[in-house]
Amino acid sequence: MILIASPFSLAHLEYLNTWHAHIKNIAQQHGLDIKVAIVISNTHLNNFLPVSTPLNIECITFPGCGIKEIDLLWARIKLFQHYCAIGARLLWLVSADIRPSVSTWPAIADSLKKGADAVVVPYPSRWNNLIPTVIKEIVVRQKKCLVAVDAHHLDTDTQIVGAGMGCIVLTLKALMVRLSIGKQPIKILWPDLHGTAEGIPLEGVEVGWFLNAYAHKLNIRCLGRDYIAQHLN
């Protein structure tokens, strides 16, 4: 299942249904059978949770409905298909456009309990009064290492939850760099929509798409405390 974060309101629901069908048709033309759920709001998102069985779920943003955006969506669907093929069960990648509400956190914890490999959530500074408590609760109760990262903030913004909670907090870029072979900084290029060799640099949330699709190469499918201690020290 692919959960698509929609910028539209409920007033556009009829249009969204058409859009939904269009996305599925594109996927089928490329030999991929997918289930798509258009997520309109946090409340709507909660209707899909908690999951009864481990699912492959990717929350993605889709800023518009033009040809360029459709092509970009298809590229992300292909990455998602590749990620599923390597056997990952569940990875939450909550984009900046869909912030989980307080009621969503128990569902995330439940997903961990049911075998999720990792949970990756944005960590905006304005959540400083809420996130530490949530992370501590999930890590302590589920005995899983939760890595909370944010694609738009520096590591210093997340240090408040890093100490004494059994988890390490890094930005997506920092995590990607530190887990790379040789621990050398790397430059990620996403092929642009015209297929040019140069591509465009990945920034912000899009780094998360790269991590999601290439998790098997970066060894982040299962982030345990021992593994993190070994590779990030």
UniProtKB/Swiss-Prot annotation:
Induction: Expressed in the late phase of the viral replicative cycle. Keywords: Late protein. Belongs to the asfivirus H233R family. This is Uncharacterized protein H233R. It comes from African swine fever virus (isolate Pig/Kenya/KEN-50/1950).
